[in-house]
């Protein structure tokens, strides 16, 4: 990224807002010629870099914005839409080899509908995600073989049809670029083979049906993999050498001009609305206060109407380690012994197509664990107990569906490291435990919750199987420990994925329902730490997602809410976690709040190159999913002082770059008699629309209305 000093005396003498043609030879050796306003490129202009890169097109306040053409010294070119320095919108990219892509872009990535023509004669037309073929698409090879169907991460994956130029075809399931699962291979003479396909001959199983004319012939299904598909290789996309957003200069000198004596006080900064609804000329700056925080401070003339500093404290590991002497130490040992037994028990390979009997509530296994051990269980130092597995085949298949490795699963829960108990039980009375690596959360369950999960398990399984990007909680196991002796105590618990298992510190977390009664945390801002779960009336941000992510988010929230409504579930919430990216860049050892100065000519403090490297790094790209590890922006909001229960605050113009995590949690509360009574009782005291306990249909509608107000498209 180059640095451009715009300090010509002529610029300061011109009236504010006047555009004119300028030619700027920059200290770096770069050269700009074109429209110029307020000491920044603004309008149409050309920028030449010393390394041979060139941009010709529209500028807006020092950034490439609108239509433009970027060329590289290698001969590669991009022509199309730009936004904030990124290739974003519709555009055509021709790489140095001659491969051509024409279609949609989001933040330098091929994303949306697009066509790729390869110099060797191959062509792909279809959907893209994060730079790779993903969704529905058609790929045609130069020899006229073609595939039509689903793609994932640049490979044929899902249901699809391959048609060879000789008339043969395969219809069925694909995985990682090859047939996998149920499918039919047909020859041009009418004969066909139907069965289960796999590269592993042991898993291959099917029946060959010859045509009346061909008769029997010697053929092996593995020929499809090693002969028929040998020429059907999908071409890869050449990496873009240097991204335009990485080349964008940082223009220094603009902010100095804006505060010079040539301007009037009222023209120094665009105005913003303060917390009490008044308008102020808040000039803000990001600074360190020397106490482990970064904060945003207003100048003296707008202090009274400012929001005050946004403080982010260093994140600390949650929970208390359960060691010997802890009241739940033996329960933890029992749990670990049971998990090790359940997961390690030999079992036949399972298909994703489960029989109805696997979901039978009576489908459970009891195992006795005497202290001295038995034929099936090891000796242990805990008390004697019984262990129950609910629907073991279903949960084993769910772990397979969620790509959970059995050995890693056991190591996380049953390894040498102890579990951690969260400091206080939830509102429901349940206790929560975290594995030491933060991957899994274990929650104790009431009998009623257990019944709800078992009842909805068939629908839940079908839903998560059909919706790869579902936001609902991932369940990995449902178990029960029954202590022997006089107490005969039963402890039921479910193992879930931890949404905040991440290498990033979670600086803010929110639990959002869309209701207002009791949805406020009483802690003042100064006492809020990263482990504080804030609620609806504490929310002081709007979450801004890129267009394609936002559209996918809306679709998935609708599908998940429809599923929960059909199952008569209510009282669920959207758990949201924010990692402020500037905090990590400023000080990796002590995470602090990063703020983007919201007004005037000041530029973003985050490097675009950092964002590009994050988005295009192969390891990080693979980790980005809907609700997981997503780059986004948040805008700080403020509630009016005269509106006590205002759910969504007014925008302030303060923006922050974040990594956002979110998912729908607490999905095991049905609208039973207790919730109906709660609704009737509270409705006599409070506004019926403000309380959480409402009919599932009304709950779903209110939840979605609220979520779609606080999550918006980042235009």
Curated annotation (Swiss-Prot):
This is Phosphatidylinositol 4-phosphate 5-kinase 6. Residues 671-692 are annotated as: Activation loop. The gene is PIP5K6. Its EC number is 2.7.1.68. GO terms for cellular component: apical plasma membrane; pollen tube. Coiled coil: none annotated. GO terms for molecular function: 1-phosphatidylinositol-4-phosphate 5-kinase activity; ATP binding. The keyword Transcription does not apply. Residues 1-21, 253-306 are annotated as: Disordered. Residues 1-13, 265-276 have a biased composition (Basic and acidic residues). InterPro entries: MORN, PIno-4-P-5_kinase_pln, PInositol-4-P-4/5-kinase_C_sf, PInositol-4-P-4/5-kinase_core, PInositol-4-P-5-kinase_N, PInositol-4/5-P-5/4-kinase. It catalyses: a 1,2-diacyl-sn-glycero-3-phospho-(1D-myo-inositol 4-phosphate) + ATP = a 1,2-diacyl-sn-glycero-3-phospho-(1D-myo-inositol-4,5-bisphosphate) + ADP + H(+). Residues 321-711 form the PIPK domain. It comes from Arabidopsis thaliana. SMART domains: MORN, PIPKc. Residues 255-264 have a biased composition (Polar residues). Gene3D superfamilies: 2-Layer Sandwich, Histone H3 K4-specific methyltransferase SET7/9 N-terminal domain, Phosphatidylinositol Phosphate Kinase II Beta. GO terms for biological process: clathrin-dependent endocytosis; phosphatidylinositol metabolic process. Keywords: ATP-binding, Kinase, Nucleotide-binding, Repeat, Transferase. MORN repeats lie at residues 32-54, 55-77, 78-100, 101-123, 124-146, 147-169, 170-192, 193-214.
